[in-house]
């Protein structure tokens, strides 16, 4: 992808569109009226907790300032689950395409024409990063950008959030998982079931995973952008996820292999989210170019 120009990869990501401005304003105005929602989103909580552990003190301070505007929990890790908790609320239907990217089989390089007019996870990440970086924007809009950015960086690292339109990212592909009697969605396996073992103690597990990110991994993971991360996910979707589910059964050995992939992607997402947030909120921190 190195020979792609930024204009080919994400035309218009360098500025905040009128549509996104309206979306952030609507989110900022509408959030206070939302009802309370239950728990969920172990993976998103873990990614944002890992990011929190890796952020600079200045960036943490900015996140805390924004999260204090939130009604209810002020924890960043909870804010990162908000985009899923409002699914089903018609006021936020416009967010639906921002969670994923559909690609034709065999795609090896991202260009902006692959992102539809209504948006995709790659464009969402890049434009939300710009919005969060702009200290002139109203605090409530920056809060919404922060929560959505935390969520979508997680989504782009889940392999099946960059998949095929024909089966809706594995949602329509049913498999038998472990000893469960009824077939379930392949997407559900990767969104939730592979993370079940972490759900009860996700905070300490997240901190352990954060401590395990070494110098070499930090160097390797501190490069690229949302388009690169999406193509990593798509490579995993084509080379591993669908191969494991080819016979309609995910057995014990395949579960172990899939959990290893999930662990790596959660760690990568957490580190990269910290990298992006440090650059957006701490002028002294290195990170993606504006």
Please give the residue ranges for each predicted region.
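Bacterial N-terminal signal peptides that target proteins for export
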Residues: 3-24
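N-terminal, motif-rich segments that launch catalysis or mediate targeting to/interaction with membranes
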Residues: 37-152, 159-290
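Intrinsic-disorder/low-complexity regions
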Residues: 2-3, 83
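Sec-dependent N-terminal signal peptides
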Residues: 23-31
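N-terminal signal peptide c-region/cleavage motif recognized by signal peptidases
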Residues: 33-35
